[in-house]
């Protein structure tokens, strides 16, 4: 099991350059840094090569996360939008591969954040999402990339809200490189049992995000971490565990995540680094790795 952190913990904008954080997370003791793929197509090949070299030099693994926009929605009723989504993913995955990234997770099957001002079609979006992921899975597989479909809470998406729904979706896609992604923040809202949800995902669990119920770093809240760790051990999970804390207001990140108050206790960068280091030690202790 490898432990990582989403670079957005320190940032306010999804478009922020993530390269400078590689050395930081290495010094803090992490194995992985997860980066947002939203703007990766804006990077030049030279920039991508520099980032890849930095990761290798610092012994850091890169993973990626993404919440596609509404105009790139693979489950849209509009065939033109679905086609735009497929083209977007093929370009994005090609650039992700240039960073030697082998895992990308998020609402790949849909878009994020969902617009609930209009009625949603869960069954239709599910079926189109299966078709859409099926349509990019082989392309991703040829690049050595696993697609990890994130199960989100009801307030952020309607298609997949539980581990059981995620498993059914992945089985319907039927591709070996398409996996389930779980996140303790979302599980806290939707699942009756963390342990049961993880065991339901079982061997299909390809990526795992952690955080407290209010998005603080692990160890600063009330999540049943020992239950979570036991379940991960029960299924012999050896993948990435990525903490995804959001504790600062402001910017597109604060707005999209709905962080309306400072959850860091007024922490400066040094204190945020310390909190991340302590959360890593806590995570290794309770979850393993």
Swiss-Prot record:
It catalyses: D-allulose = keto-D-fructose. Inhibited by Zn(2+) and Cu(2+). Optimum temperature is 50 degrees Celsius. The activity of D-psicose 3-epimerase is very stable below 45 degrees Celsius but decreases above 50 degrees Celsius with increasing reaction time. The active site is at residues 150, 244. Mn(2+) binds at residues 150, 183, 209, 244. Binds 1 Mn(2+) or Co(2+) ion per subunit. Optimum pH is 8. Pfam families: AP_endonuc_2. Its EC number is 5.1.3.30. Substrate binds at residues 6, 107, 156, 183-186, 215. GO terms for molecular function: cobalt ion binding; manganese ion binding; racemase and epimerase activity, acting on carbohydrates and derivatives. Its cofactor is Mn(2+); Co(2+). SUPFAM superfamilies: Xylose isomerase-like (SSF51658). Keywords: Cobalt, Isomerase, Manganese, Metal-binding. It is an enzyme of class 5 (isomerase). Belongs to the hyi family. PANTHER family: HYDROXYPYRUVATE ISOMERASE, INOSOSE DEHYDRATASE. Involved in the biosynthesis of D-psicose. Catalyzes the reversible epimerization of D-fructose at the C3 position to yield D-psicose. The enzyme is highly specific for D-psicose and shows very low activity with D-tagatose. The substrate specificity decreases in the following order: D-fructose, D-tagatose, D-ribulose, D-xylulose, and D-sorbose. It shows a higher level of activity for cis ketoses than for trans-ketoses. Homotetramer. This is D-psicose 3-epimerase. It comes from Agrobacterium fabrum (strain C58 / ATCC 33970). The lineage of its organism: Bacteria, Pseudomonadati, Pseudomonadota, Alphaproteobacteria, Hyphomicrobiales.
